[in-house]
Amino acid sequence: MDKLNLSHAGFKAYDIRGIVPDEVNEELAYRVGRAYADLYYPKTMCIGYDVRPSSQKICEAASRGLTDGGADVYNIGRCGTEMMYFGTFFYKMDGGFMIAASHNPSNYNGIKIVRQEGIPVSEDTGLKAVSYTHLTLPTT
C-alpha cells in the first residue's frame, strides 16, 4: 500500500479529495473506511467507484477498512455516483462510499460518504470525526 503523510489535507467540507497518491491513496482509503466503521458501526455498506485509473484499488482498500471494522460491504463496481446513492437507499444500507473526484482531473481521486437513505456526510455531520479518528489508527 502507498504510504501516507497523515494529515487532514484531503478532507474538504463535503468529501475527501486530493492528488493521487500524495493526498489520496490506498492507505488513506483503508483508514477512512476503518475510522467510519469504528465511529458509526454500520452493518451494511454500499461502495462503488468511477472510471479513474486509481479508483478500483482505492475502492478495494476502503472496503477492507470497512470490513475490518465489522461492516458487510456490497461492492457495486464501476458506476456513477447516483448509483451508489440509489443502492444505499433502495437496499436500505447503513451507508455508502463512492470513490470519485467529480470534475477534477484524472490524477485526483476522492471519497464521498453517505449515511442511511443516501444522506450525505459532511464536515458538520461526521466527516470531521472521521478525519480525526483516521489519525488515531495504527499504520498498516
Feature-to-residue mapping (PLM):
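An N-terminal, well-structured beta->alpha segment
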Residues: 1-64, 68-69
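Conserved small/polar residues in nucleotide/adenosyl-binding loops
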Residues: 133-139
